[in-house]
Amino acid sequence: EHHLVADIAWAVIQYWQTTGDESFIAHEGMALLLETAKFWISRAVRVNDRLEIHDVIGPDEYTEHVNNNAYTSYMARYNVQQALNIARQFGCSDDAFIHRAEMFLKELWMPEIQPDGVLPQDDSFMAKPAINLAKYKAAAGKQTILLDYSRAEVNEMQILKQADVVMLNYMLPE
């Protein structure tokens, strides 16, 4: 659940934007943002001419070990963008980081909204079979689906426990 790394970075930016605490962002905040950005840069894998983030578990615990989870990829990009902005604004002299961050932002592949207006949760989600969930909706919040299917089986279906892309739209409305 590496998305937590970007979630913390997002919270740091929110704190700074809300409080205007320049001392915090120039010291502790920048240190945290740089290290979390370095983590994302190291997590990316090259696939042909682009970078991708593989083998992740986004906030939706029913979809595990997937590639290019939309929530994770967008939050990772935001983390690296903000770290780069803060580094430039507060005079970070780590030229190697700046170069790596620029390349990451240029080459990271981002899941795109489909013609039907849907942002796929990950590379495989839309190809998975959908099942009728009416039986389980009456017992909402109880995970009764796990009485009929194993977690591994649920992982291979179009089923959400937490709607990653809905939360993504809240956290990064732009």
Model-predicted regions and their roles:
Residues E1-H3, E35-V47, V66, Q143-D148, ...:
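Phosphate-binding glycine-rich loops and adjacent basic patches that engage nucleotide phosphates
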Residues E1-V45, T72-S73, V80-A83, A87:
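Aromatic-rich carbohydrate-recognition surfaces in CAZymes
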Residues H3-W10, D49-I57, Q143-T144:
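Active-site-adjacent bridging/hinge elements
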Residues D7, D21, D55, D60-E61, ...:
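Acidic side chains
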Residues Y15, G58, P173-E174:
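Short, glycine-/Ser/Thr-/acidic-enriched flexible segments
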Residues H27, Q81, N85-R88, C92, ...:
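Active-site core of glycosidic bond-cleaving carbohydrate-active enzymes
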Residues E35, F39-A96, R100:
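Acidic/histidine-rich catalytic neighborhood
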